[in-house]
Structure formats: C-alpha cells, structure tokens
Design a protein with these regions (language model features):
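Catalytic-core region of carbohydrate-active enzymes that cleave or remodel glycosidic bonds
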Residues: 124-125, 234-249, 266-352, 369, ...
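Polysaccharide-binding and catalytic clefts of secreted carbohydrate-active enzymes
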Residues: 135-266, 271, 289
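A short, well-structured beta->alpha microelement
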Residues: 255-264, 425-445
C-alpha cells in the first residue's frame, strides 16, 4: 500500500478506494477487549465478497485496557492486532489503523500535544505497536481521529494550562520579538504585553467582543500557534514510526472542522503521507469538502463518509433509506474529484451508541439486514477496477481559488468559508469551469494556473499578497472580488494604491449595488450581516470592475465581494466574463441545457478524461454534452439527487468505463 502525488496504489498500481470502517458486528468498539476472530472472519469475508478494497479500524475507546500507565502495550493487545491483521490479509484488505480519537489525553499529562511527559507516553505506545508490525505491507497508520487542539472538543479554544501558556509565549517571542510592534498589530497598549502574555479569552472569539472592550486580533495568532503545534506533534509521531524501520503510510483522520476553524490539513499535511477529510454534515458543499482538503502534490482520501441521521422535531427521520443511499452515492462519486476515493463509515451499525444520529449509521443493521447503501457500495466496488487503471497523472484545472486564512482564522470566518463554498459552486455548477483550491499558507505551491481567483478575501497576509502579485508579474491573471486592504491583524494596507490604482476601501453599508461587465449590468444584493461587517472597494473613477496589466500578467478587480451577494448567478457571470476574456472555455459543450443543480466535473488523465456528475436537483436531468478534448459525446438520464461517473478514453474517443448509467 502506497501513494503517489494524487492517488493510492497497491503493488505500484493505482487504487480507486471504495472501503468501509470495520471493528466487530458483535461488540463494535470493544473489539480489542472482547476479540472474536470467528466474527471477524465472517464479517470481513462479507466485506470482501462485497468487493470493497480497504478497511479502516482502530481504537476509539478503552486505551487504559490496551497499555500500562507508561504507554507500553500489553502482549494481549499486540496479539489481538496480529489476529485482526491476519484476518484482513486473508481477504486481501489493506488496513488503516487509528491510534487515538479526538484528543490523545488518555495517557496523562497536563496537555495532550504539548506536555513532554504525555507525548513521551504516546510515542511509547505508537513505537511498540509499529515495531511489532513495521513490515506489514498492507498497513497504514492513522495518528488520531478528528483531532481538536484542546479539551474543548470540536472548537479551537485554549486548553488554559500552564504548559500551553508557556508554549504560546515561546511561539510569540519567536514570531514577534518586538513586543511594541506586536502591541501595534493587536491594537493594545504596549504595557499590556509586558511579561507573560495570556491566552485568548472566550470573549475574544466573539465578533462583538470589541463592544465590551475586548478586540479579537489575537485569535489569528492563537489559531496559527495551534496549527503549528499540532503539525509538530504529527511530525514527531511520524518520526517515531520511521525510527522503527517502518515505511508505512501515516496520516491524520480529520473531519470537516479541519477545513473550517480547527486543525487543518493545510498545516499538518506536510507532516503526513496523505491528507483526509470526513464528509458528514456539509451536504450542500460536498465538492468543496474534497477540494479544500486536497493539498498540492499530496494524495487526499475521503477517509470517512456516511449518513448522519437527520431528524424532524418529532424525532422522525427526515430521509428515507433510499434517499440516504442517494446522498451517499453523491459523496462517494465526488470523492474521486481530486481525491482517491472514499471509506464509508460504517459497515455494521453500532447499536451501543447513545446519540440518535449515531446509532443508525452503517450499511448493515444489527439484525444483519442490509440498507440500500450496502447495495450502493457493492456497485461502486464493481466499478472501481475499471476506474483505477485510468487514475494516472491528473492535470490540474486552469483555475485556482486561493483562500484567505487571514479572514478564515478571524472571528469573521463564516464570511470567508461562505465565499469559498459559493465560489466553488458558481464556478463548477453554473459557469461549468473546473477549479482547484490552494490555502493561503500553501501559496508557494500554487502551480501555474491560467487564472487565480481571490474570492471576497477582505484580508490577506503580506506574504501571501506578495506571492499572488508575483504570480501576476510572471504572466498570470488574477481576479479579486472586493477589497484585500487588510492583513491578518486587520491592519490597513494600501494594496490597490501600490498597484497604481486610485482606490480605497469603505464599509459596505447598502443593500443594492450594480456590477458592470462590459455592456451588461449585474444586480447585487447584500444582506444584514454583510452590511454589518464587510468592506467594498471604491475606485475614484466610479468603475466597478477594473482590468489592468501588471508585469507580464493582468489583474481584474471587482469592487464588491460578489460571492457574498444574495444571488449566486452574479458570481458565475463574473467568472465566465473574465474566463472568456483570457480564452478559458468550459472543457465540454452543452448539447442540451443542464439544470443549475447538476455538477459536471471533468479531470484530464494521461490516457482518458474522467467525468463525475452529481445532481443536487429535484428533477431528473438529461445529460447531453460533448467532451472538447476527445470529441466524445455523453448522453444519458441522471436521476434526481444521484451521481454518475464516466471515463472517456483518449485513443478510443468513447466511454470506456462507467458508473450509474
């Protein structure tokens, strides 16, 4: 089991991952306390017969029963894992094994990631387990499932312990050796930063803290401190694994919080061998889930996906089993857009769970009857072998969306997240232009897109801004929507003026505006929250979209944060206008109209073009398109809220593999 820059491989051949999570149908997460190889053999045999090609497992509870107080695992623990791995090997199933869940605080210490004593015990546990199995070729290690940085799970808040406080101050001293300058950045009196600097308070994470005398400018620094500290922990654990002689894959299994405000693959991705996302709740942003988790030059896996039970107020399920399966189909299909596939959570439903949205999750019920999603997984598994032989050398799309962490790691994060999501949908669903995402701290790995879009950034670090301008200097085209006149501490920067434009930022305090695209006028409307917090740009000549040469490239600058206007079509029209100006066209032509809720996303491979199609529409859609690269036509009926995949061979100029039609 290995990875290249984009996909998983087994024995050097690409692997389209269609897997599941498995512990035990009998005792679920207590499978190390009550191991039953007879049941494992039966269940894994069923998973194998379903055609699935990877399983994820590990420890979510009960660590005190696996090892002593120093982290040394008991012999029975290692023998249990050996039996499990041998059973998986019998059925040819690669295994991802997870060590910790949420917070590795089970081995003591005052801080799970920063306390040297705690980290040492974690290393002891991991080292002993990996040493025993370092030569198992089909095994990968997951350091921790869905990590949070502190005991305040699923948030980015300080733990508040002395070790964290000391580490925070050490980090600040290295990053900002001049306390007077730091005080200016945070807009506080210099004397308030004398001595030990406190951790941010809860009020500082509120956008309204300034009304009670507490500004939020330290939040960005605290989040960066947490990101870098966790990335260092992941590097330490990966190095511990490598010391054993293991060359097995190492990862972190993060959920959607990682691409929002928690520990992000944009930071810890360089510490592991592939990145992950767990696509659970963001059902309207399934594509964004994948694009934001994918890091340049590194494979990405939707390592958990499934169906949280959605309930009405009267505790009755909102979705039928068939509708749930259709949603899962869209998630699995979309996982092959710039991703390696998906692992479903979970094969056997866990009736031991107490939360009503967790208990029913899984393909096989406790009475061993199957949900429709089990059939769905079998169908994807049958398709995977014909897909994976084509998963080689994917070309990046010509358009990159650069996301602003300066905004995302502020108390106004919701605006930047919404701008990203709406930019992805406007480009891919409406303008029919495929794109990829690059986070602000990864800007040096941007690549060579023909167009970079900065969607409603409001703020950007000086380093990232310089990199974007350099990209334009060397011949790239940049589209900015709204101002980018603030840095990560919300200090004013005169970036438009520095580019030779007569312009300034001003508060966006109106509901209606117009954007002029050539001879057309696009109406925009901004809601209450946008009027309360956002800025727009004002050009002295009154224009609303400027086009200007810069170096060898060009800049298009719209004065409004278009992605955050109420009507998404306005962003799509702006994107199409700029793309047309620089001769970027959709990679397929529409032979018949497509509903706005249908995604068609092509990826050019070395020998083929991979098309993923997903419907968010309430009506069936007649897909009738022609691929521009091969001239091949695709014509079929896509059922409402379902997905389909087609592989068009470059030599054959026809569909050579398909799913869903």
């Amino acid at each position: 089991l290995s990875v290249n820059h984009d996909y998983f491989e087994t024995d050097g051949h690409p692997l389209a991952v269609v897997g599941t999570t498995y512990m035990s149908s009998e005792v679920q997460r207590l499978f190390f306390e009550h191991p039953n190889v007879f049941m494992w053999n039966q269940d894994l045999g069923q998973i194998h017969d379903a055609g699935l090609n990877m399983i994820r497992t590990g420890w979510w509870t009960g660590w005190d029963k696996f090892c002593d107080e120093n982290g040394q695992p008991y012999e029975r623990t290692l023998r249990t894992l050996e039996a499990y791995l041998m059973t998986a090997r019998k059925y040819g199933l690669p295994v991802q094994f997870n060590f910790f869940a949420f917070l590795p605080d089970v081995l003591g210490g005052n801080n799970a990631f920063l306390d040297p004593a705690a980290v040492r015990r974690q290393q002891t546990l991991i080292s002993a387990v990996v040493s025993r199995f370092h030569d198992v070729p089909f095994l990968a290690w997951d350091l921790i499932n869905e990590p949070s940085f502190s005991q305040h799970l699923w948030t980015m808040r300080p733990n508040g312990d002395p070790i964290e406080l000391a580490a925070w101050n050490e980090w600040l001293d290295k990053r900002y050796p001049d306390r007077v300058k730091l005080a200016a950045m945070w807009n506080v009196p210099p004397q308030s930063l004398a001595g030990t600097i406190s951790l941010p308070s809860e009020m500082e994470f509120s956008p309204r803290g300034m009304y009670v005398g507490v500004n939020s400018l330290r939040v960005n620094d605290y989040i960066l401190f947490a990101q870098e500290s966790f990335a260092q922990w992941a590097r330490t654990m990966r190095a511990t694994i490598r010391v054993t002689g293991s060359q097995q894959l190492v990862t972190v299994g993060q959920d959607e919080g990682g691409i929002q405000d928690r520990l992000s693959p944009a930071f810890w991705g360089s510490s592991v061998d592939f990145t992950t996302n767990h696509s659970w709740w963001q059902n309207d942003y399934i594509l964004w889930d994948s694009l934001a988790a994918k890091q340049p030059g590194e494979a990405m896996l939707i390592q958990e996906t499934g169906l949280q039970r959605e309930l009405n107020l009267n505790e009755i399920a909102r979705r039928t089993p068939e509708n749930e399966a259709a949603l899962l189909e869209r998630k699995v299909a979309t996982s092959f857009i710039q991703g390696s596939g998906a692992i479903e959570w979970l094969w056997n439903t866990n009736s031991d769970m107490t939360e009503s949205n967790e208990t029913p999750i899984g393909a096989v019920r406790t009475d061993y009857t199957e949900k429709p999603e089990a059939t769905l997984l079998r169908e994807f598994a049958r398709f995977a072998p014909s897909l994976q032989e084509h998963l080689r050398d994917p070309q990046l799309p010509p358009i990159a969306i650069v996301t602003s962490q300066a905004s995302q790691y502020s108390v106004l994060a919701d605006f930047q997240l919404e701008a990203q999501r709406r930019a992805v949908r406007a480009l891919t669903y409406l303008a029919r232009l495929p794109a990829y995402l690059v986070a602000e701290n990864q800007i040096q790995r941007l690549g060579n897109p023909r167009l970079v879009i900065l969607p409603s950034p409001q703020a950007l670090s000086d380093t990232a801004w310089a990199a974007v301008v350099k990209y334009v200097d060397t011949g790239g085209t940049l589209l900015i929507t709204g101002p980018v006149e603030r840095d990560e501490h919300w200090q004013i920067r005169h970036r438009a003026v520095e580019l030779g434009l007569k312009a300034h930022a001003e508060p966006l305090v109106y509901h209606n505006a117009e954007l002029k695209l050539g001879e057309r006028r696009i109406s925009l409307a901004f809601g209450q929250q946008q009027q309360s917090w956002l800025d727009s740009l004002h050009f002295d000549d009154g224009s609303t979209l400027r086009e200007m040469p810069h170096g060898k490239g060009r800049i298009y600058w719209a004065v409004y944060p278009v992605e955050l206007a109420e009507e998404l079509q306005s962003a799509a029209e702006l994107y199409s206008y700029v793309a047309t100006r620089i001769d970027i066209a959709p990679p397929f032509s529409l032979l018949a109209p497509l509903p706005a809720g249908v995604l068609v996303f092509p990826t050019v491979m070395s020998d083929s073009v991979l098309y993923v199609m997903s419907s968010d529409s309430d009506e069936d859609a007649a897909i009738n398109i022609r691929d521009q690269a091969t001239g091949a036509a695709l014509a079929f009926r896509l059922p409402a809220q379902h997905a389909a995949i087609a592989v068009i061979g470059k030599k054959e100029r026809r569909v050579v593999a398909k799913y869903g039609f």
